[in-house]
Regions:
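Substrate-binding pocket helix/loop in short-chain dehydrogenase/reductase
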Residues: 66-85, 131, 208
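Alpha-helical segment proximal to the catalytic Tyr-Lys
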Residues: 101, 151-152, 236
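Short, small/polar-rich loop/turn modules that mediate ligand/substrate recognition or access, typified
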Residues: 154, 159, 238-240
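Catalytic loop of short-chain dehydrogenase/reductase
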Residues: 112-155, 166-169
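Conserved glycine-rich Rossmann-like NAD(P)H-binding loop of the short-chain dehydrogenase/reductase
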Residues: 1-13
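Short C-terminal tail/terminal secondary-structure segment
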Residues: 121, 210, 214-216, 226-229, ...
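A short, exposed helix-loop element centered on a Lys and neighboring polar residues
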Residues: 96-97, 147
Length: 252
């Protein structure tokens, strides 16, 4: 297994966790929006293991800019969109393009792009954070790229699918939630986790767990199970699809 994370600490920690199970792990730390880092990651996998069978693009996020230029009112907008697209769309696209020659040569491969419910039609747009519009757009772009790539790669026995996680209280969302209940006038004093899940007083009618058919949040294990299925031989004839793992929030 080869893993990459921007945080060297996170990479080391995950490597240790995986090695407990006897997994052979190559860990690389670096900015995955940079093509040099992407090529190093792919090359390390091929050199170490002789081949790559599966690519999971579990990368995303956005950029909240602190740029302030009175002479250029679009500077902040530009910085936010550039940062968000680099992380949530450009990085997974470049990673796919880097591994495709190897997959085509072997006439085999699985690609799984982790998108977001934010990129799905019917997902409500709640303008709560500065990166919202750019993030929704980038994740929608990743879904469309997945579909187009599946059309192109099917003849090479390469499956390309996407997964859209639902309501999961990740470290990133924890940080955003804490900022919202600290500074937003409508949510001050609320519990960050309850705010994120949509069960706090200020957010109950805005969307969240109470508005989903299953009435429960999702977990990282839910997403892992979906990844395992789409990476297995059981999904040999599934390609170009986007699997929502969201408790029924979006039905498209």
């Amino acid at each position: 297994l080869i893993i990459n994370s921007f945080s060297e600490e996170n990479t080391r920690s995950l490597k240790k966790e995986l090695e407990v199970f006897g997994t052979r792990v190559v860990a690389i730390s670096g900015d995955i929006t940079q093509s040099k880092v992407i090529l190093e990651t792919v090359d390390a996998g091929i050199q170490t293991f002789g081949k790559i069978d599966i690519l999971v693009n579990n990368v995303g996020g956005g950029s909240v800019s602190e740029v302030v230029e009175k002479e250029n009112p679009l500077a902040e907008v530009e910085a936010v969109w550039d940062g968000t697209y680099a992380m949530s769309l450009k990085a997974p696209v470049l990673m796919c393009e880097a591994v495709l020659p190897h997959f085509i040569e072997r006439q085999s491969g699985k690609i799984l792009n982790i998108s977001s419910m934010a990129g799905r039609p019917g997902m409500p747009h709640v303008d709560l954070v500065p990166l919202s519009s750019s993030y929704h757009s980038a994740k929608a772009g990743l879904i469309r790229y997945t579909q187009l790539l599946a059309d192109q790669m099917g003849r090479h026995n390469i499956n390309v699918n996407a997964i859209c996680p639902g309501i999961i209280y990740t470290d990133g969302w924890k940080e955003i939630s804490e900022e919202m209940v600290k500074h937003h006038p409508n949510y001050k004093g609320e519990d960050p986790r309850e705010w994120f899940l949509g069960v706090s007083a200020g957010r109950y009618s805005e969307g969240g767990v109470p508005q989903t058919p299953m009435r429960r949040e999702q977990t990282t294990n839910d997403i892992a199970e979906a990844v395992v299925f789409l990476a297995s031989d059981s999904s040999a004839n599934i390609t170009g699809q986007t699997l929502n793992v969201d408790g029924g929030m979006v039905k498209d």
